[in-house]
Each structure stands twice: as C-alpha cells, then as structure tokens.
UniProtKB/Swiss-Prot annotation:
Keywords: DNA damage, DNA recombination, DNA repair, Endonuclease, Hydrolase, Magnesium, Metal-binding, Nuclease. It holds the Pfam family RusA. Its EC number is 3.1.21.10. The lineage of its organism: Viruses, Duplodnaviria, Heunggongvirae, Uroviricota, Caudoviricetes. Its cofactor is Mg(2+). This is Crossover junction endodeoxyribonuclease rusA. Homodimer. Endonuclease that resolves Holliday junction intermediates. Promotes DNA repair. Exhibits sequence and structure-selective cleavage of four-way DNA junctions, where it introduces symmetrical nicks in two strands of the same polarity. The keyword Amino-acid biosynthesis does not apply. The gene is rusA. It comes from the Viruses.
Length: 120
C-alpha cells in the first residue's frame, strides 16, 4: 500500500468552481486556475502516476476565514482537479473519503493524505 501526503491550495467554492450556461455546465475561470495550480503541484511532486488502485483520501481543510462552510463542498473541485492532474484515472476510485476541519489559515490550504488500498 503506497501512501502520498502533500498540501494543496484551498479550492474555490462549488458555486464559483462550476458555471452554467443554459443547460450546460462548465468550469469557471477560478476553477480552471485551481485545476492548473493543482496540476503544477502534482507534476512537481512527480505524482502524476495515473494510479488504477482503489483509494482512501483524508483531507484536513484549513479554512481561509471564519465563515461557516460546508466541508463536503470542497470535494468535487478537489477530486476533479486531482484526476485532471493525472494522479488517478477516475474519481470513482475513491472508496473512503474523510474531510476534517482544521484551523483558520490565511488563504486556506488542504492537507492531503491518499492511500492506495489495493493494486490493480
């Protein structure tokens, strides 16, 4: 079982990550920037491994301010960005997902720990 730990920037809210035009959804400029930032970090860490394994992810969400937040709203943008960056093939691979509220940190950040549950 391989384990990977790294830190990512705090994602834009779900409402600002996705946009809608008519009946079509697309990723906003903020969402595109976040995806590129995550891709750059994943490549720098040489984690663009396209794993096929089943995965467990633990996220420590250090929030950027004192506003009330639904922690589950960070998951879609985060997982989408990890897949786009080449860490795994599909967000369907995540069998165990935990999000824990951390402390307030200016700008926010996500502490990520991903464990491969089985090799394929």
């Amino acid at each position: 079982m391989n384990e990977y730990q790294f830190v990512l920037p705090y994602p834009p809210s779900l409402n600002t990550y996705w946009r809608r035009r008519g009946s079509q959804y697309y990723i906003s400029d903020k969402g595109q920037k976040y995806r590129k930032d995550v891709q750059q970090i994943i490549r720098q860490l040489k984690l663009d491994i396209f794993t096929k394994s089943r995965l467990r992810i633990k996220v420590i969400a250090d929030v950027p301010d004192s506003r009330r937040r639904d922690l589950d709203n960070i998951l879609k943008g985060l997982l989408d960005s990890l897949i786009h960056a080449g860490f795994a093939e599909d967000d369907e691979q995540f069998d165990d997902i935990r999000v824990i509220r951390g402390v307030k940190v200016p700008g926010g950040r996500l502490g990520i720990k991903i464990t491969e549950l089985e090799s394929v």
